[in-house]
Amino acid sequence: MKIVRHIPNTITSMNLLCGVLGVIFTFRGALDIAFYLMLAAAVCDFLDGLSARLLHAYSNVGKELDSLADNISFGLLPAMMFHRRLIEGGVTGFVAYIPLIICVFAAIRLAKFNVDENQSENFLGLATPACALWCGSLIYAADHGVMSFAMMLHDTQIIPIASVVLALMMVSRIPMFSLKFKKGSAYNRIRIYFVVMVVLLAVATAILKINWSYIVLVTFTAYIMLNILTALFSLRFTK
């Protein structure tokens, strides 16, 4: 069954393809399609790891390929989407290129992850998919009727500031729980609480008839804030 061993890498390659296509559509100004492709890349990123575990098809090549794909789909793509949004807003010069820092720091974060054996269950620093989906959902929500976000993005300082903050968070030492459930993990309880929160948020969003991208944006905002607060409380009680 040699073909089975190639399934995870095939899915990872689809992740990469989605990222490249997303960048192309971003250049064309089709940010909606770019966000859909980012979501598809995120699904592939989840499935390649899941299939590797189920099929026992781990490989060093797969590990490196996954990081290369992630840097395109969750590093370059969100950076270009932010850059494009600034250009469309009339921003020129150095400020318009500040979002590219996301791509650079995503590469650093992925390289650190590959050599750090302590991040097998949880992360140190913001994971690149979480960063990318926050960026993409912010733009999508602003373009589809969530007025508070649309008004926020009219301030041309928001995207550059967010880019720097997110980039620094990716290479920070802030512990962040992984969303992947693992048998016997002590962190499964907090993962369950988080999933329940997301489900309740989805129900509330459906009742209030808010655009679905709001769920994605609020979910990852809550994820980031929850981990920061947890780290602060842990630091306080360990002193």
Protein language model annotation of sequence segments:
Residues 124-239:
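C-terminal membrane-associated helical module and adjoining short loops/tails
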